[in-house]
Amino acid sequence: MTLRPGTMRLACMFSSILLFGAAGLLLFISLQDPTELAPQQVPGIKFNIRPRQPHHDLPPGGSQDGDLKEPTERVTRDLSSGAPRGRNLPAPDQPQPPLQRGTRLRLRQRRRRLLIKKMPAAATIPANSSDAPFIRPGPGTLDGRWVSLHRSQQERKRVMQEACAKYRASSSRRAVTPRHVSRIFVEDRHRVLYCEVPKAGCSNWKRVLMVLAGLASSTADIQHNTVHYGSALKRLDTFDRQGILHRLSTYTKMLFVREPFERLVSAFRDKFEHPNSYYHPVFGKAILARYRANASREALRTGSGVRFPEFVQYLLDVHRPVGMDIHWDHVSRLCSPCLIDYDFVGKFESMEDDANFFLSLIRAPRNLTFPRFKDRHSQEARTTARIAHQYFAQLSALQRQRTYDFYYMDYLMFNYSKPFADLY
């Protein structure tokens, strides 16, 4: 059958349209950015710590600035053959592989979106942070202060890891036991693990965790006894082996530390310079009986009136008449930072900035900020470096040196300067 000329022209035109369409589709696919076709992380950027969204698939989590009578040590049992590796803070400056110019531009844009979305980012903060109210930036903010806080975290983790590598080389091969995690509190909704260091803001941190867990609407509503004697927050050692290891490997682990001499003086002032129904009879009586010559009958009966040099004698005595207490124990013993890879290390001296940066990192509600009020003895001045020096001036140079030696690992791991020029 012979086709008419008009029919042939129509067939040719239709074939041309199909060919042009196929060629255009191939060209479009070849130019499309592969990062837009598959949702994946940008090469070279490892977002290991991610702001946490609330989770409801796990159950929600006493004590210490309250005077709970519990031993520091607990019976241990093996949990694993090695310490679970923690997650690192995001590292936005890792090098990218060589790419075409158009692809590089799209990757850079996508990278910025990821940084803004996932990493309100952290370098050394001055010991005296600004008195101006801290306004927590939203997820879309990435200003210079935020970057500085991110770099601070990187530096603190580096110093801590170097100290562990130098002095605790065997720690990474030890198994995690319930004793190692007995001071860690769990907040399941935002997947947070907080290691409690007494006299370093722990009361207010537990208030924050209770608000995060939905147990209170405001930190101001939570009384001291509720914080320390309630059972609202769970400790990590109350979970079974699988629950402990799961949380250690997937939750954001953080601790806050304080200059060791200031923390020690703060504990002494709180426990021995104010009426206390536990520390005076348990610790005070033993200290006075051992270290005060000709102690009065009344002092031996009540345990009140312990002086700072007597307290330091007890602290440094290898044959103490009464055991250690978490309020003046080493952070390296309380939180095992050479065994547990903490994601965030905050400092009491820069508490407001560090705490609110951490809250932004885990995507806490915008109206939740770290409380500024003093938990106990609110009319009394906080223990500062100046006040700590006044107390340590009561000691001999040898006692100061021995106390520094006692806390040497805490000074080293958390990069605190020597508080006295004659220390070595």
From Swiss-Prot:
Membrane topology: Single-pass type II membrane protein
GO biological process: carbohydrate biosynthetic process; central nervous system development; hormone biosynthetic process; proteoglycan biosynthetic process; sulfur compound metabolic process
Effect of R247H: In a colorectal cancer sample; somatic mutation
GO molecular function: dermatan 4-sulfotransferase activity; sulfotransferase activity
Predominant location: Golgi
Glycosites: N128, N294, N367, N415
E.C. numbers: 2.8.2.-
Disordered: annotated segments: 47-107
Keywords: Carbohydrate metabolism, Glycoprotein, Golgi apparatus, Membrane, Signal-anchor, Transferase, Transmembrane, Transmembrane helix
Compositional bias of kind Basic and acidic residues: 66-77
Keyword Electron transport: no
GO cellular component: Golgi membrane; membrane
Keyword Metal-binding part of the UniProt annotation: no
Top-level EC class as recorded in UniProt: transferase
Family: Belongs to the sulfotransferase 2 family.
Protein name: Carbohydrate sulfotransferase 8
Species, as recorded: Homo sapiens
